[in-house]
């Protein structure tokens, strides 16, 4: 997907500001590619490593704890000027923070019920539709159709359907949230300086998730659990944000968008390595279809 549209991931790991295409050196591009891969790996392996926390505290509790740590750490670094923002700025971060909290909770609820690779592929349909329709490319609906076929292949292992209806619905909800997140981050990124928009939206997300997450997690908290969650908050979303921000300064946004299309494949790989979620050849082909559809939509959007 093109970075002009995808300015945030499942966990807010991407930049909140649009970046123009650049023509950096070959060495800079290579470093940017490495940073993109590292960012996607952080996001997907971070999601896989979150499985024990989701089981211990529930999806709402895991979301709340991670947002509290991430928002607190970033607020200390950025020091947003809370009292100086206008009404329109507040409305923007309130909307973005609410969407972020709901999106993350929905995604965690999905991966608690269905394989990670399937959840990521379904969720990816949201930004894929934005990339297809956002540039007026109604004729390019072929790409979302390809991706949907890929999702169907992922959902069937040759013997039975691997997902359940609640998990699939949560993944669809996360995808819808991601699509809204993309549209909102463009507005918030333009309304704030530097990282203030990201910091404020994470603070709002932490507050929004508190009524649900605190009740789910508070009675189960341990010292080791807090350290584990703090580490995961660094892994997602803070480290991916930094990696992607630096990567975008070293490579064209079109190349960045194509690379980020690999995220469903990395999600499936993380599920296999961390969660022992194997894939059949047809499921691998389904993942390839989703990735190919994303790359195709990115290329046509860049041309359009």
Question: How should each PLM-predicted stretch be described?
Answer:
Residues 37-45, 49, 77, 94-109, ...:
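Hydrophobic alpha-helical transmembrane segments of multi-pass membrane transport proteins
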Residues 6, 98, 125, 139-158, ...:
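Hydrophobic transmembrane alpha-helices of multi-pass small-molecule transport proteins
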Residues 73-82, 124-145, 265-285:
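C-terminal transmembrane-helix exit sites in multi-pass transporters
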Residues 1-61, 95-98, 102-106, 149, ...:
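Glycine-/small-residue-enriched transmembrane alpha-helix faces in small-molecule transporters
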Residues 58-59, 115, 193-194, 252-253, ...:
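A helix-boundary/kink motif common to multi-pass secondary transporters
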Residues 108-113, 137, 157-165, 187, ...:
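Membrane-interface helix caps and helix-loop-helix hairpins in membrane proteins
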Residues 31-35, 61-76, 140-146, 166-173, ...:
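Hydrophobic alpha-helical transmembrane segments of multi-pass integral membrane proteins
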Residues 61-69, 100, 108-138, 174, ...:
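Specific alpha-helical transmembrane segments that line the substrate/conduction pathway
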């Amino acid at each position: 997907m093109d970075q002009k549209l995808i300015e945030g991931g499942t966990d807010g790991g991407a930049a909140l500001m649009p970046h123009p295409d650049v023509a950096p050196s070959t060495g800079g591009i290579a470093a940017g590619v490495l940073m993109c891969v590292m960012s996607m790996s952080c996001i997907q392996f971070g999601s896989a490593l979150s499985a024990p926390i989701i089981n211990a505290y529930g999806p709402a509790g895991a979301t709340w704890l991670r947002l509290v740590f991430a928002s607190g750490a970033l607020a200390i670094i950025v020091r947003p000027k809370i009292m100086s923002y206008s009404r329109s700025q507040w409305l923007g971060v309130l909307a973005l923070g609410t969407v972020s909290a709901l999106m993350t909770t929905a995604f965690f609820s999905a991966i608690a019920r269905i394989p990670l690779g399937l959840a990521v592929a379904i969720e990816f349909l949201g930004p894929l539709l934005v990339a297809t329709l956002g540039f007026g490319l109604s004729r390019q609906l072929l790409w979302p159709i390809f991706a949907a076929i890929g999702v169907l292949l992922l959902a069937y292992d040759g013997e039975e359907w691997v997902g359940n209806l609640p998990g699939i619905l949560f993944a669809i909800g996360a995808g819808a949230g991601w699509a809204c997140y993309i549209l909102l981050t463009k507005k918030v990124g333009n309304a704030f300086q530097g990282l203030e928009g990201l910091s404020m939206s994470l603070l709002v997300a932490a507050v929004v998730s508190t009524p649900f997450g605190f009740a789910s997690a508070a009675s189960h908290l341990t010292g080791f659990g807090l350290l584990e969650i703090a580490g995961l908050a660094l892994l997602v979303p803070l480290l991916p944000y930094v990696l992607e921000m630096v990567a975008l300064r070293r490579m064209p946004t079109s190349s960045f968008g194509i690379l980020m299309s690999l995220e469903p494949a990395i999600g499936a790989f993380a599920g296999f390595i961390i969660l022992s979620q194997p894939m059949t050849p047809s499921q691998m082909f389904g993942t390839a279809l989703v990735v190919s559809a994303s790359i195709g939509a990115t290329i046509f959007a860049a041309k359009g």
